[in-house]
């Protein structure tokens, strides 16, 4: 009770600080359910891979279809059904300095789920600065090399960059050496195009690169340790039953003393300000 009284002014009325937005569209949920195109493809799992990578790096990530301009990074995995109004809204977000992350299976259908007669990635082709000339659903893992190394197992867009820069290339199959992940400067912002699924470690490293480019801070912690940033404080939670050295330092709001980074099993710590 006494601890809660000390924290009251930091908690009551405060809000989580979200740097990233993961856009989930139910139109696209239903659209992908109708047309899988690849046996192991699952739209929800595709979204989760981006969410998990952000969580692993302790980036507060909202999940909605909200105001893009409120976030430094907007992730739109497999955003295939797009209205003309959405297209313009997304374009303006990037022009004004936002960082947009697109993936394979994006931009090719209108609000009625009708295919647009356009080269891939459809309405996003200009801002992504690429053309996906072909795609493959590989029968075995395909290696990925470049700024991020890993593998793809479900989907591979074969990308021809126009104004975009290649970040990763494929290391096997008939498209060996072709672009797998790109980034394009557009207006004051940038657009990442992820042409394939990625294993967990590779996805985490890609999200780290994207976050750094957008001036979003990442925090590495041991497994089971969560960091939540609010307006005037940072909350650290140990979801493990054992004591953990989080390596995080700061002034504790419980007693005003320097926190040494060690949390008891299932322990929690409130630190002053944002770490």
Where are these regions (language model features)?
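Carbohydrate-binding surfaces of carbohydrate-active enzymes
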Residues: 1-275
